[in-house]
Amino acid sequence: MTLLVITEQTIHSLCLDHGETNQIIAEIKQLEKPELLFSYITDAEPLATGEVFVGPDICGNCITHTFRVPDYVAKPPPYDSKRVYYPYSYTCLGFDSHPYDYLLTLDTKSIFQAIRKITLTRKLSIATQSDLDLIILKKLTTQSNCQSRVSSIWRQCVAACLAFEPQIQNNNSTQSPNLNNLVKRMFATLLKPIGRLPFYERRRNFVWEEEVSCPTILPLLLYSIQNLVTQFCAGVINRMEMILAFQYYLDCGVTAYQDEKLRLQKLIRNWLREGLAKFSKIAMPNWTVSGVISCTTVKPIMITTHEAREIKSAREAREASVPTYLLQYINHAIHKAISPYQTHQYWQATRVFANDGTYFASVAALTLNKAVRPRIEETTVKYPNSRYLTMNKEHIAVSLPNETDTNFGLACQFVKQFIPRLVTRLKNTNFQEEFIAFLTSSSSGKDFEDAAIATMTRTIQRVAKKRIVAAGLESRSYLNQQFIADECLAAAKLVGRTQIGRRQRAIAGVNNTRSLLGFPPMLMLKALLDMTGTTSSGKQMGNYLDLLIPLGLSPYANVIFNSADVDAMDASVQASVQQIMWHFVVYIALQLERTDYFAFTSGDEVIYELVEGKDSVATSIHMSGLARSCLRAMHLLQPQNCVLNDDIVGELVTREPTFPSGQPFTTVHHTFTLSNAIMGGTLRVTNLTNQPSTLLNLTVQGDDTRTINYGPKGCIEKCIDDQSSFVSDWGFKVSNETSSHTSEYLQQRVSCGTFVGYPDRVSLFAAERPKEGKTMKEKMSEIWSLVTDLGCRSRDPQRLVRLMYAIGVACCCRLTIRTERLVAEEFIASEVGRACCAEILVPKVAARADRGVMLRYHYPISALWLEEGGQLPPLATKRRDGTWTCFPSYYFQRGDSNRYWYWDVSLTEEKWITTVEMRSDWDSNNAIELIDDEILEAYATRYALAALGLNKTRQMERLRLSEESTIFDVEQLASGLNAYRNLSKIAISHRASERLKNAGVELPDSVLYSRHTQSRIQDAILKAQMTEKEEIEMSLYFFKDKGYLRSLRELVKSKSGDLAMIHRCEWGERVTILESSIFNVVSTTPLSMEVYPGSIMSFILCYTGLKGAHSGQLAGLVGLLQGKYGGGKISELQFSIAKKIYLTKPYLLNEFIIACGLGGEAELALKNALHAFEMLRGVEFSTVHTPRQFFFGVDSGVTLGNHLDYPNGFPGTRIELAAHLLLAMNFLSSNAQSCTGRSIRVRVPRGMWSRCTNF
């Protein structure tokens, strides 16, 4: 039986004809049967031992590999009850010494047989080592293995098969035919020996067929194949790299898959500098400080002594451990690469070998010691002292030291120049209100006793652990110092965090009270570090401007980069190092007079000055409440033990105090410490030697640092040694990467003047937390975000469109909800229900009648590109006259561009000429007349819109926030927190909102300053997981509303911005990109893996120019047309409400501004935005702008002026010109794959924009 024929053709061609929509639904529905799904993904011959593969690598050079299938694939080793797998000490040491942290490769059947044999007579007990091994193995196999992001692992396998082209498209004689259908061959290799799907997913767990024999690591290997498809579609690897990677993954799985990958991953990818060292000189883009390329520069490569030593050490370590076939590939890459760009291609491929895209998940107790065990790496750091003591004999930094022979003194030498500005900035800060705003709806880690929340409704009880709710419950206790002390002295709870490419971490789940004391240093140090210029998140803009410093300095001779990473920084922070931060923070807090902070009030305090050789001298100082809280925190938050409540072995306490990694100040503490270590040490050496330092730039974020040194080679090498020793003096061990041409910072690399991203860090199919019930829009929005993150790191992002559609069709085009049987049957019998193949699922286990039934229906494929649905770039669809809409583009800008498809597919050229251009009265009200109902029906648009009508957020509000008792509880919780906010401002806001209410304008809580806290508590309530009862009640809102019975015109309604839909763009005759200032550079030199000569983005950049060069008077108007009002000072909801007030009751606008608590810049921004809105009469063409999608280029259209043709005459007004630019950008981004450098013709009815706007 041939499966998914039309679906495969559609995804591979990305074209959809009228009659294929219903066929795709029918084909996808076939995969509801597990045996058919198994048949589809294994429809190929398995890979065989001894099979020889020959083909081109990612750079086109021929390579060969003889495949070998390890024995465990068909015959996994059985569980042996006599063997100890995860030795447990049965003491406070826990799993102190054990060879493996992650899942071992064993036969699942033998594990479940052993468990069943024991549980026939008794329960498994952790008191017996063999029982404990079984409990751990079961959890790792069923729970830690489950990482599916979008749908079940099996449907994700279908998506991988759909996205991968089964046949080689070109007639390449060097490529062996056995590379055809490669993905299905990989799946067949793993699954055909089993003969069926060996497990299914339920509630974030795998439920295994206990009589089926298969390897425990099978799910991880399936995810790894899915990831290989992702990387293949992105152009990062070719088929031969897929074979090598799959071979490596299978080899890693012989004993312990994840442990082996961790052991080798750094060694496999440690060869980049060695690969680049073969080039004596490299042509690099010459970036200016504003982010513009002026020309290219040829830079001689300088290999320092440090770099040569590091390269030699890396090669020796690699050759001692890495499998031979991977070593051969790396040596092949070093030898065959003819340019730095090809070296980068090969290096990215080896990163994929090292990282399969899965998360390193395990039982937290197993990885605890490696995650948090304290260690002293280099030096024991002395505690900072002060000559002043409090009455409790605590050192207090009334003044800063001047000496340079202590770490504290060195730190102060660097930062004291910023202190006056810092104090001025902080003086008007309301620390209490800032802390309340800091609280989120994440878990606080605190379990409330039943008595403490017994008076609250069930709705509140379910979310009591959320930070904002927990703070409301204990808000009055924040005025009690004893309560704060008791809460802080309790051991912090550790929680495991899994990551891609890094071992499992343990994060301290810091409760609200600890956060309360840890918040002031975070706020103070964040403000300080902003001033020093050494701190950088590295990702503020999300585009190349974040990398401008290393990009700009790369072409210069005598510049050396040193990327340094502190090994295990959380575990290496000594208590004395923390005290240095606290001493500084206390000193700053002492300057902020009369700043109270919860239980800590300002007042006079007696302190004692230690005078050498004399008795201490008592004196009185004024101490702010903030300083008192910081003094208390110095001792309450450190030293601190943590406890892990493991659901297998119970409670484990860390043996020694460790750094509280979950504290608000964790990142700024590390940044502050490393900045001071390097800058303080540099200042000391400069002053002692009277010689200038070669340190040109320092950036630090957490445990990541990058120094850029400029000067003679010998001086630089000495300074780099000094910088490492400065960090060592603070007790840290540093790993350096020194180079004149490549550097890494925060997982972003600049190499040879280009951006080289890490595509292996993006996983589309695996997630830290398995999938939850999400709408299609939520799922596809997440996929879009990941794809654009991957695209800018990859060679061929256009191919990712096919992958997005494969994921959408296989994983997101169905919805399963719980509802009442009669309602479900009524929907199934409806026209929409029949079209969407709706059915009631038969449960595997009989359910109670009051639990309702599970209804499943399928979305038409058109739902994937509608604005209410997935918002993917629309497939190429056929119009009435046989012409097609544009081919879907990776650079497509979501939003109103999706709505434009209604007009694009409806308007033939003949209709445009005879109907559109012949009339001059078009506006946003009558634009809807131009859509073709019949053609939209042919693409099942009505069915798609009807099926997408289930709005979970709105219906959840009705369910949870309608009970009076819940509303009362929310008010009570908020009142406790509001007591710490600006009470006068709250009162003013409340009175203004009451006046608006009396005038007939009722505002939602989320825009009101006075009800900001209530709104955030409500958000926490809405985010709680749904109960079965809520699922049923929520579905009833949708089905009883009968929205699925509406007509197409009821579902596609007019919008105020529909005027912008009446346009047509096409390629012109003029070749315009030759005049671009960047053309000569991008046609010869790569800027990144995505931008290289001849790439799609290299053409687009010649149209848009670089972001650094973005300027022009029309930028503001184009922004207004895109719906960008207020410059980020006001929220979208605030502006939406303000528009209605402005148009209907403008005299109430000032009351609205007061009620929202807007002032200064925000008030001015709102009034300017409303004025612009009035001028535009609400016309806009709003699109989503993702920085990484246009990593280098301007994505607004404002720079396209020289590339436009105006067949209906040059625009007569500025707004009409801005509209032409915006519509041209929409065309360019939607048609990027057909871009050849020609001009863009924008066709708009003459004078339409001038008539419909006030500009």
UniProtKB/Swiss-Prot annotation:
It is found in: Virion. The keyword rRNA-binding does not apply. Keywords: Hydrolase, Nucleotidyltransferase, RNA-directed RNA polymerase, Transferase, Viral RNA replication, Virion. One of its GO terms (biological process) is viral genome replication. It catalyses: RNA(n) + a ribonucleoside 5'-triphosphate = RNA(n+1) + diphosphate. This is RNA-directed RNA polymerase. It is an enzyme of class 2 (transferase). InterPro entries: DNA/RNA_pol_sf (IPR043502), RdRP_C (IPR054002), RdRP_N (IPR054006), RNA-dir_pol_reovirus (IPR007097).
